[in-house]
């Protein structure tokens, strides 16, 4: 009696075999993606004004952003000379903010300037100190206030200028320059006589 164990063959193969996955991919159809760009038609209305802000033109451009208020540029830039130096202007660059509202009078227009006119610089009516003056960046006193109060103008090794009292008080707390934090001590600064 010989018993044979017949081997069974599986038909169709394994469920997750590579061949099965390949057949599944080949038989399922995927919709093709169109790679062509569709043109978009731009309709330009007659009343709209288009301002190209990316180009550099020689003429100043005025843009009305709110339809009520507009900025008018009086003088935008200085014109260069042949040798490359800029011309000096006696008037300040400025712009005028005006309103279309009839209720507002012309006296209420706002003038915005980026530079101080020479007349106010000469009179000294501005709160800003002209260049060339010495002041302490800690107490904000100018040269005349420092000298009137019996203090000295002192400079550190790193070149920063303070009044003697402020620098002395600062060095009591930290042995560094108050401006650049370079290590200094009470022997590393000296008075300046102007």
From Swiss-Prot:
The modification Phosphoserine is found at residues 98-99. It is an enzyme of class 2 (transferase). GO terms for molecular function: DNA binding; identical protein binding; nuclear androgen receptor binding; nuclear estrogen receptor binding; nucleosome binding; SUMO polymer binding; TBP-class protein binding; ubiquitin conjugating enzyme binding. Residues 1-36 are annotated as: Disordered. It is found in: Cytoplasm; Nucleus; Nucleus, Nucleoplasm; Nucleus, PML body. E3 ubiquitin-protein ligase which binds polysumoylated chains covalently attached to proteins and mediates 'Lys-6'-, 'Lys-11'-, 'Lys-48'- and 'Lys-63'-linked polyubiquitination of those substrates and their subsequent targeting to the proteasome for degradation. Regulates the degradation of several proteins including PML and the transcriptional activator PEA3. Involved in chromosome alignment and spindle assembly, it regulates the kinetochore CENPH-CENPI-CENPK complex by targeting polysumoylated CENPI to proteasomal degradation. This is E3 ubiquitin-protein ligase RNF4. The lineage of its organism: Eukaryota, Metazoa, Chordata, Craniata, Vertebrata.
